[in-house]
């Protein structure tokens, strides 16, 4: 009984955090999340399960969707970390969205890893094609001090949150491209998301109602 109580408290805390985050981050994030009925705190996926990654001769690029319907499928500690990040950067994201005139941008985390010394990267060259439409970043909120240098040493990384116009669907196949390279690995992620979504709903349904 004690173990069940602890587990329930943890899930309750994560759920409360999700509610708190939605009340603090900009309205575009609240609006998108409010439409998602997927409960918080029942996911088990790891970040590596949903990251799209590919490499050039100098860089490895990782693309992580930050849509609520995706990150709610992650393990509670991982969701909590990303939710806290969105909360911390909420004002910067709101300002970036306002500058571009996009009310509800799609948020994506992009990471560049240096594979060689003095590896150069071009942030604006990361694009997403969804439903036959090419989306280019309309705003970028850097998370790493070295972002503006556009250059990395070997094993060094630069991370940022990208803002794209609304319209990218993470429920369907899509393609991430960078300087002539294209990766459609997200199509292979979809079955994993579908299975985990069903499991999350099943786990949540087994919990006693308050």
Pin down the residues of each PLM region.
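Conserved functional micro-motifs across diverse proteins
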Residues: 32-210
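A residue-level detector for conformationally permissive "hinge/kink" positions
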Residues: 10-12, 26, 124
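Bacterial N-terminal signal peptides
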Residues: 13-25
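N-terminal secretory signal peptides that target proteins for export/translocation
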Residues: 1-9
């Amino acid at each position: 009984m004690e173990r069940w109580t602890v587990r329930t408290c943890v899930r309750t805390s994560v759920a409360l955090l999700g509610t708190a985050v939605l009340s603090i981050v900009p309205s575009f994030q609240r609006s998108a999340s409010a439409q998602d009925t997927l409960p918080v705190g029942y996911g088990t996926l790891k970040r590596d399960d949903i990251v799209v990654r590919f490499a050039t001769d100098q860089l490895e690029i990782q693309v992580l969707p930050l849509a609520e319907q995706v990150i709610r499928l992650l393990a509670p500690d991982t969701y909590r970390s990303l939710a806290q990040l969105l909360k911390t950067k909420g004002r910067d994201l709101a300002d970036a969205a306002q500058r571009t005139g996009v009310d509800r941008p799609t948020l994506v985390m992009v990471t560049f890893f240096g594979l060689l010394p003095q590896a150069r990267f071009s942030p604006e060259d990361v694009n997403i094609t969804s439903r036959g439409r090419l989306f280019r970043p309309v705003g970028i909120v850097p998370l790493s001090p070295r972002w503006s240098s556009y250059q990395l040493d070997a094993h060094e990384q630069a991370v940022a949150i990208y803002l794209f116009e609304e319209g990218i669907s993470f429920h369907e196949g899509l393609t991430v491209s960078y300087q002539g390279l294209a990766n459609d690995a997200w199509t292979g992620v979809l079955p994993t998301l579908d299975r985990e979504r069903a499991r999350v709903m099943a786990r949540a349904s087994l919990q006693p109602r308050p």
